[in-house]
Amino acid sequence: MLCTGSNASTIIQEQKHQQDSASADHRSTLLGLETELKKDSRSLLFSCCCLALAWAAALPRASAAARSALTLASAFTLSLASTAAFSVFSLASAYAPALLCFCETFGSLKGYEVENHMNASVTMLEEAIMYSSFSSKKRIRHSSSLTNDLIEEILSRLHSKSVARFRCVSKQCASMFASPYFKKLFQTRSSAKPSLLFAIADYGIEEDYSMKFFSSPQLENTYEKTSSTLVAAAEFHVKFSPDKSIPIYLSEDPRYVSIGYASGLIYNYCGRYVGRPLICNPNTGRYAILPYRYTYRKAYSFFGFDPIDKQYKALSLPYVDGPGRSKVLTFGAGDLTWRNIKSHTEDISYRYYEYVIVCFDVTSEKFTFVGVQKFCLLINYKGKLDVIYWEDDVDIHEICYFAKDLDEYLDENLDADATNELHVWVLEDVEKQEWSKYAYTWTDDTFFHRHLSIAGATASGEIVFSMRKYTSKQPFYVFYFNPERNTLQRVEIQGFGEAFRTTCSVRTFVNHIEDLDVNDLEQLNYIGTRR
């Protein structure tokens, strides 16, 4: 749009009038705060904080980073003012303007920058609450116009492990954090910002098998990003190192160990003669050792969550042509025992399909079957079953069950000159078994085959690929592939650190959310090492 001289002059005058009005508003605010300066030292610091917030909001031309830094400084000043006399809830009430104003500065920041700045703000809030709770024995009640609902809205932005720590601050905190309303609010907040969960297994020393859990923001609609490589920060949760007296086997070999994820919990199942299965909370490190499940031959095991009865279930299936019974273990209520169910092999027909997908209803505990033409990987794609496989010479079935070493097998069988395709089949109708089929050509498929695995799909339908191994000497990447737009976005994950002794195995899970009900599971009796 072109502007004439008179139009430009009018626009300038309007902008000047708006700036004068804003300045007048801020002068009025400052005059009002001047009155507060005469009260006491607590009001002095509080007013200084509000003054900084006012100037933070009055800098439209300043960079987002500068505004964020100023707001953080005012928030820190407010926390200092509160530690002298405020109770925990008074501190949260006073901290609310800083948090709300701080959130408003995120409009021009990228997703991963928002997460990094919010983590810093939340950390400051945690320190202020913990310090104020124990630094003063005498509490001075501070009136606040903020309601309890708004306080809960603010505190619902904390991490689950922070909520677990704050429960010991006071009975009032414990009561609020344990209420169904707050748990639902917290879960809703967490579901709106799912993350990628990384389980990194360190096998540098056989006597010290351990697994470290990290998370990073899960990006959505990455095709809108202009950068060829984005950067996301990884947050450390806990180092999981079970009791050495308990026979648990952690291995990167997919032939012997399966690691599953369901609704916030990790399931680790070992082979026939090694270890015992366990369930672990990657946020807190609490875990439960499950009863030993002996099978005559090799067995498969899977993990799922029943959203109706709110129960976790582990499924154990014997080898298809061998003896044994299918068994289910319910976790979350009652005794931890494996119980027999109808075998899945009784209704399988091999006349029409060489491969069959066995579907298990976690609620009804009944099996259904879907035939496929090729051994493939399964993911949840927008609520539908999605099977993925590569059109090349690599046999996934042979890799999983016959190859002695995955890296050695890939070196011998990958064809660097092959023009391979990624095939994606979406099950549109379960009853009729109708599929939608898609094929995508890759220009650097050897790299994907050699170093990456499919982690799953986001809610927006982007398929996430993650590197299978991590070493501190090389960067770690995840890739977001959008099938609808045929775009690929690379994201570097930073923050794993250099503490790992050797090259480590990495398992990546999508759509990880924090649930306070998971932290309250009574059957998670043990606590893993936190170092």
Swiss-Prot record:
Where in this chain does the record put each F-box domain? 141-188
PANTHER family from the UniProt entry = BNAA05G37150D PROTEIN-RELATED, F-BOX ASSOCIATED UBIQUITINATION EFFECTOR FAMILY PROTEIN
Its protein name is Putative F-box protein At2g02890
Q: Which organism is it from?
A: Arabidopsis thaliana (Mouse-ear cress)
